[in-house]
Amino acid sequence: MNVCAFSLALALVGSVSGQYYDYDIPLFMYGQISPNCAPECNCPHSYPTAMYCDDLKLKSVPMVPPGIKYLYLRNNQIDHIDEKAFENVTDLQWLILDHNLLENSKIKGKVFSKLKQLKKLHINYNNLTESVGPLPKSLQDLQLTNNKISKLGSFDGLVNLTFIYLQHNQLKEDAVSASLKGLKSLEYLDLSFNQMSKLPAGLPTSLLTLYLDNNKISNIPDEYFKRFTGLQYLRLSHNELADSGVPGNSFNISSLLELDLSYNKLKSIPTVNENLENYYLEVNELEKFDVKSFCKILGPLSYSKIKHLRLDGNPLTQSSLPPDMYECLRVANEITVN
């Protein structure tokens, strides 16, 4: 076991920088005949069903020929989408519109719901004030980050929607609670960097990953997370959590592998399940280390599975850690203190 001291500026382990830009082309596309291509765009023979129209200062969607399944329109000046923009490409599967000037009022009609094969829709870094729609039932991955969204429309019927990225918007908890209830396939939800003061009610119980960092959340309702029976990754860093707002067993979730409570106002370590592997508590107000927060009892077969534990930026020091901590955290690779 390593007991180390790190600078407070150390980046979080498991940074997700760039995590929502996954544009790899499936291998099965190799060897196909390239379709016709819009003259201003690029349709390489190595990716015959992909059309790249990035960084062209386009102000509207170009002509998209039949056969295109993967359409990239990033870093342009597109400020509207006509209802007939994709009539020739009913087999379109990926539509990437990041870094444009789109507003909701200029996205016409049912332009997206007509795309019955659409799986990925990315409209990050635009000027949206609410979610787009209606959307096709085929959709699996919706990314609307870095907009000005304060309202979510209906997601009814999106039975395949698995990933939703909504970070860096202006969402409050009521807007979220009313919209996501029926998404039974949803596994990944990122609501970080919004304006929530409470945890939203009615989130789908199918979630495996939930990011709520960089909000203004100060209270965890009793047994709020208990219904998420498969939850594995939970981030609540950079909120306003204090001991008074965190019931005793809030995070005692047997499925949880990673919990981030860093940059809050906690004075004691919230109890976690022995299955937790990564626990981030840096920059709180922790005054003591209670072994019972990790191990209810100690024995040959009773110990915590913690691998990484961050405690730096707290009043705790290495000398204040109790000796039985090492027996409880016997498989830890790294414990960071001041």
Curated annotation (Swiss-Prot):
Where located?
Secreted, Extracellular space, Extracellular matrix
Which residues does this entry mark as bearing Pyrrolidone carboxylic acid? 19
Q: Which residues are glycosylated?
A: 88, 127, 160, 252
Expression across tissues: Cornea and other tissues.
Q: How does it assemble?
A: Binds to laminin.
Main location per the UniProt record = secreted
| Coiled-coil blocks | none
Q: Got any disulfides in this one, which pairs?
A: 295-328
Would you identify the family this protein belongs to, as annotated? Belongs to the small leucine-rich proteoglycan (SLRP) family. SLRP class II subfamily.
Recorded superkingdom? Eukaryota
- Any one biological process term the GO annotation gives: response to growth factor
Where are the Phosphoserine residues found in this chain? 304
Task: Report the GO terms under cellular component.
Answer: collagen-containing extracellular matrix; extracellular matrix; extracellular region; fibrillar collagen trimer
Which segments carry the LRR repeats?
A: 67-88, 91-114, 117-137, 138-159, 160-181, 185-205, 206-227, 230-250, 255-276, 277-296, 305-326
Q: Which residues form the LRRNT domain?
A: 28-66
**Signal peptide range:** 1-18
Query: What are the Sulfotyrosine sites (modified residues) in this protein?
Result: 20-21, 23, 30
- Name it: Lumican
Q: How is it modified after translation?
A: Contains keratan sulfate. Cys-37, Cys-41, Cys-43 and Cys-53 are involved in disulfide bonds.
Alphabetically sorted, this entry's keywords are:
Disulfide bond, Extracellular matrix, Glycoprotein, Leucine-rich repeat, Phosphoprotein, Proteoglycan, Pyrrolidone carboxylic acid, Repeat, Secreted, Signal, Sulfation
UniProt xrefs under Pfam families: LRR_1, LRR_8, LRRNT
